[in-house]
């Protein structure tokens, strides 16, 4: 009888719900949607020792798509942990989760907390997730759903770009110049910079409704001035009109590049001596073109930025960044991103596997920012 009682105590007292995840075992650079499949399973880890998370929402980011294509430098390990025939990984790097249960003795988290993963490659395109270490999760209680789902990539990237490379003098006439001014990161950059007393010159593509878009970027998102790519590449504009826009004693100290090609060289030319250009993306798929004279005679520093690698080197920096952003959202200094997001609903109770897969595929193939929101 004693042995039987001992056996009962050792058995798990909790059971996992059925997990459903979007997995991939291979890659396809031509059509990454073909490698995704929906798979249901029960985790192999012990329920009593694991933190159980219920997914609330996850975005579809360019880095997620690049991982499916097999062209991203950071990828999760494919394993047999999900009871698949071939080693597989769960797609997705970002999302917000609700804590459903915690192991006995866990004091850092409580049931009902909203959390996000500290690191990439955790597999967020799923209805449930388990975690063994509460230290790899960051609490984001108090944020709205869309901010919480996207703060780890776009929010942290924008904040660190503005704050980690230049010591700003808010009493001076100091500027950031950036291309891709309509991107989610750029919109946060202008708001973070405005809160720091730093001005921003945002470059956007030429378009028929340029004036309308520029007005929104300036009035809603805090850009000091918006110009077109044509103006950005026009030497006469830079010589005659740009000084008037910048004002007296202006210092363009930082350039943020996520386009590459001609656009990157044009924003680099606007920097003061010993200025810094940070490249964090390459939308044009063209190489960064920086004039040799800027490097030799102007002391230009051209650096790369990658939030994934920064977090690996210094995890606390991301935790601190999230805390700072949460304070800014709480103080009303940052606009929630919901207005710029395409919502995709995953009705957990009603949608079958085919419907879920089709919805996510549509999100991958659509323009703009898509966030999958789970309806429980």
From Swiss-Prot:
Coiled coil: none annotated. GO terms for molecular function: enoyl-[acyl-carrier-protein] reductase (NADPH) activity. It catalyses: a 2,3-saturated acyl-[ACP] + NADP(+) = a (2E)-enoyl-[ACP] + NADPH + H(+). The active site is at 72 (proton donor). It is an enzyme of class 1 (oxidoreductase). One of its GO terms (cellular component) is mitochondrion. Its EC number is 1.3.1.104. SUPFAM superfamilies: GroES-like (SSF50129), NAD(P)-binding Rossmann-fold domains (SSF51735). GO terms for biological process: aerobic respiration; fatty acid biosynthetic process; fatty acid metabolic process. CDD domains: ETR. Homodimer. Catalyzes the NADPH-dependent reduction of trans-2-enoyl thioesters in mitochondrial fatty acid synthesis (fatty acid synthesis type II). Fatty acid chain elongation in mitochondria uses acyl carrier protein (ACP) as an acyl group carrier, but the enzyme accepts both ACP and CoA thioesters as substrates in vitro. Required for respiration and the maintenance of the mitochondrial compartment. This is Enoyl-[acyl-carrier-protein] reductase, mitochondrial.
């Amino acid at each position: 009888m004693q042995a039987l009682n001992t056996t009962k105590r050792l058995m798990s007292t909790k059971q996992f719900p059925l997990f459903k995840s979007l997995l991939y075992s291979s890659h396809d650079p031509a059509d990454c949607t073909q490698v995704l499949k929906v798979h249901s399973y029960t985790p192999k880890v012990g329920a009593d020792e694991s933190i159980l998370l219920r997914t609330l929402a996850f975005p579809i980011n360019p880095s997620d798509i690049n991982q499916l294509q097999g062209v991203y430098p950071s990828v999760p390990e494919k394993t047999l942990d999900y009871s698949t025939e071939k080693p597989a990984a769960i797609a997705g790097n970002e999302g917000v989760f609700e804590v459903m249960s915690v192991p006995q003795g866990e004091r850092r988290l409580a049931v009902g907390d909203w959390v996000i993963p500290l690191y990439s490659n955790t597999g967020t395109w799923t209805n449930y997730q388990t975690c063994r270490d509460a230290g790899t999760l960051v609490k984001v209680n108090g944020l709205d759903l869309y901010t919480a789902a996207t703060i780890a990539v776009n929010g942290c990237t924008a904040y660190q770009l503005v704050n980690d490379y230049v010591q700003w003098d808010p009493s001076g006439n100091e500027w950031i110049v950036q291309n891709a001014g309509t991107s989610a990161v750029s919109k946060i950059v202008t708001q973070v910079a405005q809160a720091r007393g730093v001005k921003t010159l945002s470059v956007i593509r030429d378009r028929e409704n340029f004036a309308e878009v520029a007005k929104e970027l300036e009035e809603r998102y805090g850009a000091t001035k918006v110009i077109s790519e044509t103006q950005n590449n026009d030497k006469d504009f830079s010589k005659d009109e740009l000084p008037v826009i910048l004002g007296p004693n202006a210092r363009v100290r930082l350039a943020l590049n996520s386009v590459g090609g001609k656009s990157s060289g044009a924003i680099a030319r606007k920097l003061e001596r010993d200025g810094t250009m940070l490249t964090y993306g390459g939308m044009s798929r063209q190489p960064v073109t920086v004039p040799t004279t800027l490097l030799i005679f102007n002391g230009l520093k051209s650096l790369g930025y990658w939030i994934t690698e920064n977090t690996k080197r210094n995890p606390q920096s991301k935790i601190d960044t999230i805390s700072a952003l949460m304070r800014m959202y709480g103080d009303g200094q940052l606009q929630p991103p919901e207005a710029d997001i395409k919502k995709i609903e995953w009705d957990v109770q009603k949608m079958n596997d085919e419907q879920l897969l089709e919805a996510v595929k549509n999100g991958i193939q659509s323009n703009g920012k898509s966030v999958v929101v789970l309806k429980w």
